[in-house]
A protein has these predicted regions:
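Predominantly extracellular beta-rich ligand-binding scaffolds that present long acidic/polar faces
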Residues: 1-136
Length: 136
């Protein structure tokens, strides 16, 4: 049986420091021992920071790190930093489980786990229309 998180928002600063730290706006870690976690129709506008002495410190706007999950129809406009892998949407262990229909505010970084959109595209409703089209 799958577990689902939907229609959630993160508007705050989230920071995690420690060995193998993994932090996200909605979820920090979904590992292969857990049930499949479905995250949909969620967003983050807060600052997410992951730091680790051993170099992991993974950080994602929606999910810090996932191996057994499905992420769809989400967006991030918050700042994401970390000492390990960093993703505007989610750090994924497997290429075949990339998030779908997810967007992030474009800057100088590119992210394979989402689609970059400009501030104008967020403001004029383009992103909203794409998210609405992706709902069930």
């Amino acid at each position: 049986m799958d577990e689902t998180i939907e229609n959630c928002a993160s508007l705050c600063t989230v920071s995690c420091t420690g060995i193998d730290a993994r932090v996200g706006g909605i979820v920090g870690l979904v590992d292969y021992n857990s049930r499949t976690l479905i995250i949909r129709d969620c967003y983050n506008i807060g600052k997410i920071t992951g730091r680790s002495d051993n170099g992991s410190g993974d950080a994602g706007g929606i999910c810090g790190f996932y191996m057994n999950g499905k992420i769809s129809n989400c967006y991030n406009v918050g700042e994401i930093t970390g000492s390990g892998y960093v993703s505007k949407i989610a750090v994924s262990a497997y290429n075949d489980s990339r998030p779908t229909n997810c967007y992030y505010l474009s800057d100088t970084d590119t992210d394979l786990n989402g689609t970059a959109k400009t501030a104008a595209e967020f403001a004029n409703g383009d992103v909203l229309e794409e998210l609405k089209a992706g709902q069930r």
